Amino acid sequence: MRLQKSGHVVNISSSLATQPIAGVAAGLLNLTKGGLESVTGALAMEFAGEGIRFNTIAPGVVNTPMNPVEAHEFLRQLSPMNRLAEVGEIADLLLYLESAPFVNGEVIHLDGGAHAGKW
């Protein structure tokens, strides 16, 4: 990336890194993903002059096999939009970031607004 004077790193975090939920054991997640979100900004500043960008996508609950259908009713309540994110929405956001050369150092939450506060 440095040789070609361009590049883009997109990290994947979690909305839990900055919006913990009571009863959800996420200490290790907070430690690792919180650090990842912090280093995104630091690296964005360090390498911006070389044309290399760093961004992070922080999804909330995503509709994957990791979340069984039986749990969906409860999990939907964790989003003010009352639904789970879809994998394709993460891909869409990634494609947007690839097409937006002036977006750098951002943590973008894909959680229906859950990170914004309580509802």
Which residue stretches match the model-derived regions?
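Residue(s) in the substrate-gating loop at a strand-loop-helix junction
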Residues: 14
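C-terminal substrate-recognition "lid" of short-chain dehydrogenase/reductases
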Residues: 86-110, 115
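Short, flexible catalytic-loop segment of classical short-chain dehydrogenase/reductase
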Residues: 18, 54, 58-68
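Alpha-helical segment proximal to the catalytic Tyr-Lys
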Residues: 45-49
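Conserved catalytic-site region of short-chain dehydrogenase/reductase
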Residues: 17-21, 116
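Active-site helix of classical SDR
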Residues: 32, 40
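Catalytic Tyr-x(3-8)-Lys segment
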Residues: 70-89
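A short helix-coil junction within the Rossmann-fold of NAD(P)-dependent oxidoreductases
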Residues: 1-8, 19
